[in-house]
UniProtKB/Swiss-Prot annotation:
Entry GO terms, CC: cytosol
Ranges of residues in domain GMPS ATP-PPase: 199-388
InterPro entries named among the record's database cross-references: Class_I_gatase-like, GATASE, GMP_synth_C, GMP_synth_GATase, GMP_synthase, GMPS_ATP_PPase_dom, Rossmann-like_a/b/a_fold
Active site per database record: 86, 172, 174
Assembly notes: Homodimer.
GO molecular function terms noted in the UniProt entry: ATP binding; GMP synthase activity
UniProt KW Protein biosynthesis keyword: no
Catalytic EC class: ligase
Protein name per the record: GMP synthase [glutamine-hydrolyzing]
Record's keyword annotation contains Nucleotide-binding: yes
Binding site for ATP: 226-232
Gene3D superfamilies according to UniProt: 3.30.300.10, 3.40.50.880, HUPs
Length: 513
């Protein structure tokens, strides 16, 4: 992958740690660009990238297991500072002539270390709390190394070879549980690697615009726009770079939130003066979904039909050379390293036809989600759009459980609009990671006025999370929930009951289908 910035880089090598993305994010938060790459990267490739420093991540393996992950030892002779974290420290010890052995028992959780005031621990207290997670332990350090931190359970909590600027820590500085973890990483990045920290969204835009113009020239780009944050930011960035050479296709499948289709056209078509083709394909999608209740089948139909509609519209355009996509850095990481774990497939509609003769352009594929939001703000996209709720590709199609009908879509659309309005009024938008309503397909007896009803139940799902991999239900104030419930049953036809989902992930997922 081409580096997003022709400037300071901290290279993180992946050994399978669940925290490897966190390392990259922590470095970027310091204003220094960082990328995560497979541990099998060659020395020549590292030389080409010219990083200011290299971090070796942790990992679940033992350095003595058959087939355990390793690196080319020549990396230590490049004159580039190296920091090994947990497995990275054990591997460094082994490759440079020290000794590592299996510990009697796995050390997992908080521990107290005593550190010396050297480059890594500069300005930090001697005694500090760290997060350990390892089953191997260093029993002898290589020649040229000295101990710079110990703990009650290990003499080698941190080590250094100051002359070669090679460091190792047996704990995880990237996690919040490590008291001064960010400070330690900052010391490595700023003091040891001598990075200045000038990576910002503003200079990212300047460099990316220049790259896009250089690559595209006078040719044309096509962008599939969903109205979501990622595709919107991609479209605005491309428009800033190449103007009228960009055409966006917005497929309105009728499964959008209330007013969303019109909002896309107003905010981006008119507000940014972009060329957007809106395809009203509601009837086409509903015909295909008629009688279908299985969630996987619904996803497949919606995804395939999106491709067919997009393909039909793209075929009407001439002289288009590039197809733009809102691929994020997390997608690149998950598909690009040998240590990546297979996870549940994303809801986002993908799989555009392989026979489309376009070059792919992915201008935000080096950014995490929060960085994409920051980029959107820097590009002038209104804050309320940048911070909109995540929305799955199949849209409301997976928030209506069972068969989809226009009446059911209307219930979800209206109830969801009420939920979002109340959350906004109460100032909870940034406190709740994701929130929406679902129609679970349950009808129950109720009383409205003097009449008996037998109507639908609406479920409210609201969760707190950091990255969506795990989540807990949001502790919304009861009075706020009561306000939401009262408005839904009074303002949305055919609803007489509202329930609140108090399940965490795992065991449940955030979406119901």
């Amino acid at each position: 992958m081409e580096m997003a910035q022709e400037q300071e880089l901290i290279l993180v090598l992946d050994f399978g740690s669940q925290y490897n993305q966190l390392i990259t994010r922590r470095i970027r938060e310091m204003g220094v660009y960082s990328e995560l790459h497979d541990h099998e990267i060659s020395v020549d490739e590292i030389k080409r990238m010219n990083p200011k420093g290299i971090i070796l991540s942790g990992g679940p393996n033992s350095v003595y297991e058959e087939g355990s992950f390793t690196i080319d030892p020549e990396i230590y002779n490049l004159g580039i500072p190296v920091l090994g974290i947990c497995y990275g420290m054990q591997l460094t010890t082994k490759l440079l002539g020290g000794k590592v052995e299996r510990a009697n028992e796995r050390e997992y959780g908080k521990a107290i270390i005593n550190a010396k005031s050297d480059e890594l621990f500069f300005g930090l207290p001697a005694e500090q709390t760290v997060w350990m997670s390892h089953s191997d332990k260093v029993i002898e350090i290589p020649d040229g190394f000295e101990v710079i931190a110990d703990s009650p359970s290990t003499n080698y909590a941190a080590i250094e070879d100051k002359k070669r600027r090679i460091y190792g820590v047996q704990f995880h500085p990237e996690v919040r549980h490590t008291e001064y973890g960010n400070d330690l990483l900052r010391n490595f990045v700023r003091r040891v690697c001598e990075c200045t920290g000038e990576w910002t969204m503003e200079n990212f835009i300047d460099i990316e615009v220049e790259k896009i113009r250089k690559r595209v020239g006078d040719r044309k780009v096509l962008c599939a726009m969903s109205g979501g944050v990622d595709s919107s930011v991609v479209a605005v960035l491309l428009h800033k770079a190449i103007g009228d050479q960009l055409t966006c296709i917005f497929v309105d499948h009728g499964l959008l939130r209330k007013g969303e289709g019109d909002m896309v056209m107003e905010q981006f078509g008119e507000g940014f003066d972009m060329n957007i083709i809106r395809v009203n394909a509601q009837e086409r999608f509903m015909d295909k979904l008629k009688g279908v209740s299985d969630p996987e089948q619904k996803r497949k139909i919606i995804g395939n039909e999106f491709v067919y509609v997009f393909d039909d519209e793209a075929a009407k355009l001439t002289d288009v050379d590039f197809l733009a996509q809102g691929t994020l850095y997390t997608d690149v990481i998950e598909s690009g390293t040998k240590t990546a774990q297979t996870i549940k497939s994303h809801h986002n509609v993908g799989g555009l036809p392989e026979d489309m003769e376009f070059e792919l352009i992915e201008p935000i594929n080096t950014l995490f989600k929060d960085e994409v939001r920051a980029l959107g703000i820097e590009l002038g996209i209104p804050e309320h759009l940048v911070w909109r709720q995540p929305f799955p590709g199949p849209g409301l199609g997976i928030r209506v459980l069972g068969e989809i009908t226009e009446d059911k879509l209307e219930i979800v659309r209206e109830s969801d609009a009420i939920l979002r309005e109340v959350v906004r009024e109460e100032g909870l938008e940034r406190d709740i990671w994701q929130y929406f309503t679902v129609l679970p397909g349950i009808q129950s007896v109720g009383v409205m006025g003097d009449y008996r009803t037998y109507d639908h139940t609406v479920g409210i799902r609201a969760v707190t999370s950091i990255d969506g991999m795990t989540s807990d239900f949001a502790r919304i104030d009861w009075e706020v929930l009561q306000k939401i419930s009262s408005r839904i049953v009074n303002e949305v036809d055919h609803v007489n009951r509202v329930v609140y989902d108090i399940t965490s992930k795992p065991p449940s997922t955030i979406e119901w289908e």
